[in-house]
Every structure is written in C-alpha cells, then in structure tokens.
C-alpha cells in the first residue's frame, strides 16, 4: 500500500483487489532421490509407499510445502502421516542433504534440471499425486507500463529457459 514496489513475482492463490495479477509460470513439484539411493530402482511409488519413505522437506510456511500439503489433503493424507526426517530452509540445502542420504525430497522440477542432466538425481512419480503451482507477476492496478512492463515482456520471452 505504500507504493514502494513496482513489480513482484508471487506464488499462491491469495488475491487483493487493488493489485493486478498476471500469470507468468506454471511449476511442478516432483519427488526426487539421489541416484545412489536404494529408491533409485523405483520409477513410481504409491501414496501408501510414500508414507513409509523417509522425507526431507521445505520448512513450514514455504510455498513448496504448502503445495504438498494441499495435494496430500485431496487424498486425506496429513503431513503427520508421512515419515519426515527433516525440514530444511532452502532448495539447495535439500539437494545437498539428499546427496548423502536415503531420503526423498519434494522440489520444483525447475530447481533440479542441472542435477537431472548430470545424473545426480532421479524423479520418482507418485501415483495419483499432482503438485502444480502458479507464479504471477503482481503490480498495482493501473501501473502496467514503463520498466515493469518491459521486464515482464523480457521474462515472458525467456521463461522457457528457466
């Protein structure tokens, strides 16, 4: 409300009437394991198997964890039903942790492209669990010109490389 930020990139479904939301990017969360993990031999696990797998997840309040909670809720599964070994505060810390553990992580597919390409991690499908989220540009209503508009054009042009 103090007009200090011309443009923001946000995740989530919260909407305020004085702000303009422009869809930018869809992201998928996936289950990953290190290729030295015993879970490497699996291509897909069930929701019941997910309850038994040791997990390392993002911290409470993170958008990533919120998307997981929402997806699990659709199947009447709570976080407390899972075998959570640890909550960590960043994507990079989860990736480092997974390199030396038998745990599974839930992260954005976009955050692990390099590791998938190098063969460090493998994506495991979780049968019937869909985890997508949207990112939107946000700006004050009527403030859709100038440098913010130019940046949005630039970002939209190059978003497939993200």
How should each PLM-predicted stretch be described?
Residues 22, 48, 95-96:
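Alpha-helical segments flanking ligand/cofactor-binding loops in enzyme cores
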Residues 124-162:
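A late-sequence structural motif
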Residues 1-29, 33:
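Short beta-strand-centered segments that line the small-molecule binding cleft or hinge
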Residues 20-30, 116-131:
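Short beta-strand->loop
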Residues 36-46, 142-149:
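Short helix-loop capping/hinge motifs at secondary-structure junctions, enriched
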Residues 1-4, 10-11, 73, 77-122:
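Hydrophobic hinge/microswitch elements
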Residues 55-76, 145-146, 162:
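Secondary-structure junction motif
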Residues 30-32, 38, 54, 104, ...:
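Residues embedded in well-ordered beta-strands
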